[in-house]
């Protein structure tokens, strides 16, 4: 069937900010879809609220709207642009929910807009638990015994009939939000209440737990002609009970017999056909390991996290083809872009094993509950490819960037059998490592299988790795053993430790013995047809398939998995750098290991290597390709951390030299550079012992800001107000010694300013200056950023520009630099300089029209700023106001404190733009998920140090008609200022108290700055968590509160009696 000619304009709905459960995979799928539709000649309009993506670049669609993904704003765009159709199935759960909302509101019918791809009825049938269960019954497909419930009484009824454990699955939610497994009544009350609250239709499915079954996924495609294929089938190493986004997944499935594979394949195709899905779809199934009994768990009627993984695992571009199917093309008409010979109706075949391991944020949130269940907690994931499962798994482990090079963690060696048993049964992020440790300690596979029902096949693979460890240790220097270990994926780092040598010595030993890996191609067809894709993985085998050309090449290091502090912004910079390298006439080679991102789409670079970002794996590629050099400044801290080791291997680092990188990162060298340039900075010193730290803090005076050197995302950074807090930090947050000093600065309570600039060593160009709403002390990634600055005097702006130019030249920066300043008592101080791409690069690039990563790359390759038409100075400011607001995933991470501080906690960002600050802030806050009602109640509980400041805020809330609620201490302060307030009981009161008000939704905002104790059980922590669990905006910074007040005041009409107005005027005359 040819493509449709009755439609011209298509609106694509993006997925919004990155949150746990919905990460960079939708930037990848959305970008592919927009390009795919443009290829077919359609006019594409895109709406998305996330400025950090390639998808929201102006080149991706014909028109790009970076606006909140709410009914109000999307309807406005539809009425203005009048598209013929919308495509919502590439925007994750956000896109689907938006489509349902638009249809129900009547706006699609009013404007004559059709939904493309999967029909609305199919979306609802797959997403609505009741409709889906009915369809499965009609198809005679087994689902676990279940019941749809809308309240707790119905839940009790089901449990009384079926017994515990039961799984709670809320309808229309993302990443299992609000769901979980209930083993008793207490858990049932908590999880069902939470699930009903998070479901937009107040509906949950309660089902008998089938935890322990194998979890299998099929990624399927279907077109309007009813052609349907399986793109990839995948198997979770963790049995049912752990969310698939938190499971270690392998592809293709490893433990299914042919009969089981065909049975589940047929089921998946039968379901996609019955639903009438047109495009990509993900089917999740549970298989009893001891019989052929299976159950259908759920269907995602859209492109998902799993489809991004399946696309990268097979090379088959699901999103690209789903977009073509949406406009009427069929699988037998679409040429497979990988082979460029076969058609898209050929099912991919794999001659390798792919492993995916999730990347969790627990290194950031040590107090978080690490237990894994049906609610997703991972922020990102890594993927690796090998010729056997052992190799594939070990490559994935060292891709995680946790400083781990093998399936072993030192701190687990102390665990006794009972503790290991408990943790293996319960499942947390370290389960696979504990399984390996248990096998090392002599626990049998049978016992482990009994504890967690992990398949014997996977346990055998872990045992193979453990047995090989013993071989390696028993045969020091044996080349045959080394060869076997390398074939199994062992790293040089592990072997070096076992043989008491350096990693470099093992590397040299291998090279002398011609023991190097070859590179194989990912081609969708198991080498049956010739492939046109330059997409490779390493393995120890015979034939090398990566042909080196005679063109000059440049390697760009990617940024690895998405995690807090290093998000999709770095992938954005990486992709733009690759494009610039190609424009400059070089061959662009990228090394990365994140299956969710645009940078690992094989069509972006000239060559893509899907490999761990370790010195060993990167050097294998450099040894083969012999590039002109390596660019490290776009891959975040991941790439910067490799620079020194690469230079030791004789590799040329392009752009800012290693010496100058070190000068910006090393505290003493940086201080010396600032002193030489005459640029002030907060008083600070470096401590290498606890005693030194205490002495320095006494000398410069509390409060102090403490942090380790060389960090990203403010990891282990804290503001401490007294000695006991400092001692707690030194003991628990960092391991301080001569190689890892701790930096201690005077903490200045001032306005924070952030600048991104490009330097060629002679000229320094500044695209933009941003002002943070929150004062210094809140991490820049968690602050609301405003461009252009709204409250900076021209004099201060000139100082900032002068300092930036001086730093760019003085530090010999070639490429990008990011500087954070604090304005304190009308003086500008430098807090830090990052000689690399920052997370504000996409935001500023989009606003100013300066493609910063592209310009910086060309500078790195030798084209100076003047030749590119820029030169030195500050780019003229835009007229509109732009706001970058952070987005948090606290609802997914139980027992994490939501207080903002110098350690970064946000997972994503949104942008709001308008003619005034108030309007831009409104859009930014609404897009980030904060509801801004014009009236209601606000609970105020603040620390003593904030009481004076809180009075002015309380008064302003009262002025616009809000009710004020406060506990006794704060209430008394308000009453003394004649501000009406209702006293509420503290949280330890037996009677109706503050937490009850939050639980019952009787407060719209909670302002809480209670001193954060080191024990999370403190009152403030409980208030903040209760707010998050109940979807109430909890403001822990008075600066953020003021920003919200500005918005509320601009939305609210004043209501003053004439007498009040007259009195005010008379007062002004008297004081004139």
UniProtKB/Swiss-Prot annotation:
Mg(2+) 1 binds at residues 284, 298. Composed of two chains; the small (or glutamine) chain promotes the hydrolysis of glutamine to ammonia, which is used by the large (or ammonia) chain to synthesize carbamoyl phosphate. Tetramer of heterodimers (alpha,beta)4. Residues 930-1072 form the MGS-like domain. NCBIfam families: CPSaseII_lrg, PRK05294.1, PRK12815.1. Belongs to the CarB family. The keyword ATP-binding applies. Mg(2+) 3 binds at residues 820, 832. Residues 1-401 are annotated as: Carboxyphosphate synthetic domain. Its cofactor is Mg(2+); Mn(2+). Disulfide bonds: none annotated. It comes from Bacillus cereus (strain AH187). This is Carbamoyl phosphate synthase large chain. PANTHER family: CARBAMOYL-PHOSPHATE SYNTHASE [AMMONIA], MITOCHONDRIAL, CARBAMOYLTRANSFERASE FAMILY MEMBER. Mg(2+) 4 binds at residues 832, 834. One of its GO terms (biological process) is glutamine metabolic process. CDD domains: MGS_CPS_II. The keyword Lipid metabolism does not apply.
